[in-house]
Amino acid sequence: MCLSFTGPPPATRRILPNTSAGVCGRDAADVSPDGLCEGRDVALFGCSAWGTDEVELQTDFEPLFEAFDRIGVKGVKTACFASGDSSFEHFCGAVDVIEARLNELGGIQILEGLKLDGNLSSNGSDVEDWANRLLAAL
């Protein structure tokens, strides 16, 4: 099994620190979208979001998101996570936007997205719980 993980590299170690599965961590800013998910069992996508009137994806994630039709996600299990600020109208809206697009392209959502108020470090128990549920869903 290989988990393809697209998000900030430090997040890879925090989300799935103790899995024996092969984890292929990639920074969204550094990947080519072409076939990114092909041959993968699971693809995880992490992206911060902000914006008061509408969801704004993290700037370095936007080019990848705009090319999602080329990532080859059809039939691949997917899950998403984001950190954000709960005072914003669209709290962690990146999760909703990314999940919707992956589902539209034939990805198989296996778990409700993780939405964290603040950062991964300050939400350790929530991250651990989500990671355990993710691994159980595989």
What do these predicted regions represent?
Residues 3, 7-27, 34-138:
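FMN-binding flavodoxin-like domain, especially the glycine-rich phosphate-binding loop
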